[in-house]
Each structure stands twice: as structure tokens, then as C-alpha cells.
């Protein structure tokens, strides 16, 4: 009987020890689980999914995209976060654009970036209900296309960066270079919202100055090429194009037509000059991309409401002059730069190429 009692006592003691070990094990496990979880949150970066859509493959817009990506990568390293970027280009096709945005919504991106006005307006419409934040880039006149309520307080779920063009400044430069201009060709795509305001401003400027103008339009590269040839046949003295993506895409196909006819092409972006226009006047598109990325980070990392983030505009006083075209026009770059200087914050040279160097 005593042996049985001893056995029972030993069994009970063993069970009590097991219970104590179990309790202690649970407590230790909880501590270890919490600590690594906190450590994981601290040491492993949060990932934000960003959908970027470019409107068309041209030097200015490509430069914006490249700088958005590189700046987000830089911010990610500094802030210990990751940006999972989904990038696509609709190549000016509305159906493709719609599908790209639909895919972004289906993939549950945290934010969309629309490069150029048509992409931004399409994203605005697609996010009216789901309220996915949208940051636009290179939208010349966000007020006129009703992207924002005001530049200071955009409202809704959208904000961005604008490449607003000072059209009068371009014409001041044009007439400083050649006061004897009698007729100016206005080359643009009537379907580009970004061209509407600067073309209207150009007409008002020329009407006030008493200078004639003729309009030449095209929606494809072939149509733009024919329009350029028509301007040459009409013997215009100079040609103006705003920040028009259709003409930008066509510039490499038309610049020789103008240069051989000794007609200077004045445009609204440095990428035109890169692709063979005489002069491009406007914003620094590399910086535009950087600031667009900074906005994206401010919204995603800092929790800013897009509707409360003011639209960013820029000093657009940089004139980029193509030195190759200067020679073909019989002009001296140094003399041209001196003439342009009073109307610009900076005059810089460039040579004809397809893309900007990284």
C-alpha cells in the first residue's frame, strides 16, 4: 500500500511539474513571438504598390518616368520602405489606357501616377468611387481640364505636378530673335487638351502684335509630317508648338523639313530641342519627375490627403537651344544665347539625339 501511495505521489508530482513547464513555456513563447514581430515591423520595410502609366513614348515623358522611379528608390532606401512599381505605356491608345487602369485597380495598387493629361483624366474618372489616390505629372493646365478644384487645394483624391507653359515668353524670344516675322505657323494636335490654352494664348499674342498666323494640325506622325510640309510650302517665318505630345512624338520626323527650309521651330519643352527643334522653352522634366515622386512618398508614407496637397508648378524659364539646328539656320549659338538671355533664367545648348543621357 505504501508503495502504491509513493507511486501516486510521484505521478502527481510529475504532473504538477509538467503543468508548470507548460505554463512557463507558453509565457516564453509569447515573449519570443511578440519580440520578433516588433522586430520584423521595425526592420523589414513596408511595401507600397504604385501603378505608373505613361501616355506615349517620348523624351520628355520618358525622362519624367525615369526620375520618378529613381527618386522612389532613393526615398525607399532612406525611409526603409519599398515601392513595388507597376509600369505601363498606353502609346496614346484610349482602349489600352483603360485596360491598364483597370489592371491597376484589380491589382489593388495603393496609388496611381498618370503621366500627361489624358492619363490623368482617365485615372480621375476610374477612381471616382474607389478613391485610390492619384498623382499626375506633366499636366499643363489641370484647372481647365477639371482635374482639380484649385491649384492650392485640389480636392478629392488627386494632386500632382504641372508643366504650365508661359506662351508669351516664347513669343517674346521669337520676336527678339527675328523682329521681322510676318507669319507664324501654329503646329499642334487639336485632340491634345494640353495644347488648347497655349494655342489660344498664342493667337491672342499674335493678334495684339498684328502678326498673321496659320494653323497646321495632325493626330498621327504621318499627318504631322504633312502639316510640316504644308507650313514650308506656305513659307511661314517661324513655327510654334506647345507641350503637345503628338508633335513631340513626331519631332524626329519633321525637324529636318524645317531646318532645310530655314524655319526655326519654337517649342514648349526641352525634349523638342533634343529631337531637332530650334528651341525648347519650359520646365526641367527631370526635376518634374523627382518632385512627382516626392509627392507620392508624402501621400503614402506620411499619410497626406491628395486633395489637400497643392499642385506644384515650376519656373519654366529655361531655353534649350539645339546647336546643330543653329548651324543649319545660319545662326551663331553664342549670339542666339545672348539674345535669349533677358527672357530666360537660363539658356543651355543641346545636340540632336533621340533620348536624354542618363
Predicted regions and their residues:
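C-terminal motif of bacterial Sec signal peptides marking the signal peptidase cleavage site
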Residues: 18-22
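Bacterial signal peptide processing site
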Residues: 24-26
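Hydrophobic alpha-helical segments within soluble ligand-binding/sensing domains
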Residues: 42-43, 141-183, 283-304
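Extracytoplasmic "Venus flytrap"
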Residues: 44-70, 75, 86-95, 191-195, ...
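An alpha-beta-alpha
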Residues: 50, 68, 159-209, 305, ...
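Beta-alpha junction/loop-to-helix N-cap segments that form part of ligand/metal-binding clefts
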Residues: 86-149, 244-259, 263-268
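Pocket-lining segment of extracytoplasmic ligand-binding domains
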Residues: 193-265, 269
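Hinge/cleft segment of the Venus flytrap/periplasmic-binding protein
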Residues: 298-358
Amino acid at each position: 500500500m505504501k508503495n502504491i501511495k509513493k507511486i501516486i505521489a510521484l505521478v502527481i508530482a510529475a504532473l504538477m511539474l509538467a503543468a508548470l513547464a507548460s505554463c512557463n513555456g507558453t509565457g516564453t513563447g509569447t515573449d519570443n513571438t511578440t519580440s520578433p514581430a516588433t522586430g520584423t515591423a521595425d526592420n523589414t520595410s513596408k511595401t507600397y504598390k504604385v501603378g505608373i502609366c505613361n501616355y506615349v513614348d517620348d523624351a520628355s515623358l520618358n525622362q519624367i518616368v525615369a526620375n520618378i522611379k529613381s527618386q522612389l528608390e532613393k526615398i525607399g532606401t532612406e525611409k526603409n520602405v519599398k515601392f513595388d512599381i507597376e509600369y505601363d505605356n498606353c502609346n496614346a491608345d484610349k482602349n489600352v489606357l483603360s485596360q491598364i487602369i483597370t489592371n491597376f485597380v484589380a491589382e489593388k495598387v495603393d496609388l496611381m501616377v498618370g503621366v500627361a493629361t489624358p492619363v490623368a483624366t482617365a485615372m480621375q474618372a476610374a477612381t471616382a468611387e474607389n478613391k485610390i489616390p492619384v498623382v499626375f505629372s506633366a499636366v499643363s493646365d489641370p484647372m481647365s481640364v477639371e482635374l482639380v478644384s484649385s491649384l492650392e487645394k485640389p480636392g478629392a483624391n488627386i494632386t500632382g505636378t504641372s508643366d504650365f507653359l508661359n506662351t508669351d515668353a516664347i513669343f517674346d524670344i521669337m520676336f527678339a530673335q527675328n523682329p521681322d516675322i510676318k507669319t507664324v505657323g501654329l503646329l499642334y494636335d487639336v485632340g491634345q487638351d494640353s495644347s488648347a490654352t497655349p494655342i489660344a494664348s498664342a493667337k491672342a499674342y499674335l493678334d495684339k502684335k498684328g502678326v498673321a498666323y496659320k494653323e497646321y494640325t495632325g493626330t498621327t506622325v504621318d499627318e504631322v509630317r504633312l502639316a510640316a510640309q504644308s507650313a514650308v510650302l506656305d513659307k511661314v517665318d517661324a513655327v510654334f508648338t506647345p507641350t503637345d505630345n503628338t508633335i513631340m512624338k513626331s519631332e524626329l520626323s519633321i525637324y529636318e523639313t524645317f531646318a532645310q527650309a530655314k524655319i526655326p521651330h519654337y517649342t514648349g519643352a526641352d525634349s523638342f530641342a533634343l529631337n531637332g527643334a530650334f528651341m525648347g522653352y519650359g520646365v526641367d522634366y527631370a526635376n518634374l519627375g523627382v518632385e512627382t515622386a516626392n509627392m507620392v512618398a508624402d501621400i503614402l508614407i506620411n499619410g497626406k490627403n491628395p486633395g489637400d496637397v497643392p499642385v506644384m508648378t515650376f519656373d519654366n524659364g529655361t531655353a534649350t537651344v539645339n546647336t546643330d539646328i543653329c548651324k543649319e539656320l545660319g545662326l551663331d549659338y553664342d549670339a542666339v544665347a545672348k539674345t535669349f538671355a533677358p527672357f530666360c533664367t537660363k539658356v543651355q545648348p543641346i545636340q540632336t539625339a533621340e533620348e536624354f543621357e542618363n
